[in-house]
Amino acid sequence: MKIPVSRLEKFTSDNARVDTAAIQSLPNSRKIYIQGSRADIRVPMREISQSDTNTSQGIEKNPPICVYDTSGPYSDPDTNIDIRHGLLPLREKWIEEREDTEVLSGLSSSYSLKRLQDPALTAMRFNLTRPVRRAKGGSNVTQMHYARRGIITPEMEFIAIRENQRRERVTDLAKSELLTRQHPGQSFGAAIQEWITPEFVRDEVARGRAIIPANINHPEAEPMIIGRNFLVKINANIGNSALGSSIQDEVEKMTWAIRWGGDTVMDLSTGKNIHETREWIIRNSPVPIGTVPIYQALEKVDGKAEELTWEIFRDTLIEQAEQGVDYFTIHAGVRLPFVPMTAKRMTGIVSRGGSIMAKWCLAHHKESFLYTHFEDICEIMKAYDVSFSLGDGLRPGSIYDANDEAQFAELKTLGELTKIAWKHDIQTMIEGPGHVPMHLIRENMDLQLEHCHEAPFYTLGPLTTDIAPGYDHITSAIGAAMIGWYGTAMLCYVTPKEHLGLPDKDDVKDGIITYKIAAHAADLAKGHPGAQIRDNALSKARFEFRWNDQFNLSLDPDKARQFHDETLPQEGAKLAHFCSMCGPNFCSMKITQDVRDYAAQQGISENEALQEGMAKKADEFIEKGGEIYRKL
């Protein structure tokens, strides 16, 4: 009898690979690279090919459409993915060239060393050891520090190319305004540029209006930017819990999330083997990884918040920084005086990190050690270029609690902490709510810009109603689209399992696609240059009944094709000038095309063709007796 291989054994075997679904190219898409000023700046994009259009005047070529690509090497057919070896260190040479870091002889965290020396963990450990780096004594290695010194790093050039999405090629190739025409947007005072330059990237980072999460110990990450004046980004949360999931599950969730468009991934693991899980994820992730270090610190004291200490938390920060975590959520704004403000709430403190620190504050009747040791935290962050994501530990967990005293008291504190972080040249973004009805969302954005000095805003939704468990990806996407339009730089996705359970791969995909819609809708509303090109291309394909192009240009080609084929599965149906909604005789687009073709044949305008058709129908009505209702 064959003994089934356990998930752990399967994951750590020599031929371990990500699941094949995550590395398949999307239909009619190919990975391309745009080279920068040096050979090792190769910016990945996804190019979607289109078929030709047959017109009465002949063949019209439709240009390929380039879109932002977060999938890393996983979608490159020329790359052999082996998760036991991780990804290639893309940024390693750039980091070495700056000559401001040093390779450590060993790990600095006592907990990391303890895990390394435990033989029981050998089977699950990521065994390819990467050298650990730290800033040389007295050096600051943050992208903000370089930016403020006037230095344009390779990361900044990479980002500028990436943000422009090669749209100049569409502008050059398009023979009309059909693809490049765009509605003017309302940006609410943002400084959105027609073209992103490396200098603009540098300036935005220097001013604190954007961050480049890029730990020097995560050289595998492809540079990206989070800021109000750039494309709206989305984050995907993954992570195990005490009730389930494995290392393999979480690595697969990560690769699945980035396939569908996750710009960053947060590992929120609270179950077993958090350290090992995170190592596997980081070594195989081409996108920035964020964490909430207090979660792991709590595990180290067996879940007893009152037993947490600064020393335990400090060691956890160093442990994770040396693994390569790119940004830390730190709930330093949860202060002792704010905790009583939550007593009037319907749902109290719903943030895990916020509740941990509130309990600690009450148990010791002291200010949080995250607040009192904030400058010490800054010293650690700038030695590895870990960005702050200042946590909203007092965010509202219900519509009832939206925009209350506790929430905005914390927001003001986060603004004060931002200035301290900037004094150390540490990149910083601010986390936001939460549960907020639509008419109160704008106030959140306005106050964040005011109190936090235009540091990037990173929000969870917000959810706009509390009545739809199982559909909170939708309730939150409504709020996410709105706050993204108002100026939020990154949206944290919500899956259908929110408030109900641990999301699986399908939930991750649903959350990603839903939030890609919200982010793109926000880009359109802001008038982000080039945001409408993909919409225009898909609309043109739809009008011309180029079904496969319509599927391929969509955010989820698989689902679009599946829905079409449920009623019209034949291959010939993908050439038909109708769908199953209206059928062949009532398709509005088909009727419009017939009018255009008739006008072209008769050498008259479309309006003249419509008037001529109306006159013929009027004559036909009179000829048949002029009766409104005729007997059949």
Swiss-Prot record:
- Which residues of the sequence carry a binding annotation for Zn(2+)? H435, H499
Q: Which reaction does it catalyse?
A: 5-amino-1-(5-phospho-beta-D-ribosyl)imidazole + S-adenosyl-L-methionine = 4-amino-2-methyl-5-(phosphooxymethyl)pyrimidine + CO + 5'-deoxyadenosine + formate + L-methionine + 3 H(+)
- Which biological pathway? Cofactor biosynthesis; thiamine diphosphate biosynthesis
Cofactor: record remark: Binds 1 [4Fe-4S] cluster per subunit. The cluster is coordinated with 3 cysteines and an exchangeable S-adenosyl-L-methionine.
The alphabetized UniProt keywords are:
4Fe-4S, Iron, Iron-sulfur, Lyase, Metal-binding, S-adenosyl-L-methionine, Thiamine biosynthesis, Zinc
Q: Which cofactor does it need?
A: [4Fe-4S] cluster
What does UniProt give as GO cellular component?
Answer: cytosol
Quaternary organization: Homodimer.
Which protein family is it in? Belongs to the ThiC family.
- HAMAP family in the record, alphabetically? ThiC
Q: What job does this protein perform?
A: Catalyzes the synthesis of the hydroxymethylpyrimidine phosphate (HMP-P) moiety of thiamine from aminoimidazole ribotide (AIR) in a radical S-adenosyl-L-methionine (SAM)-dependent reaction.
Q: What is this protein called?
A: Phosphomethylpyrimidine synthase
The organism's taxonomy opens as: Bacteria, Pseudomonadati, Pseudomonadota, Betaproteobacteria, Nitrosomonadales
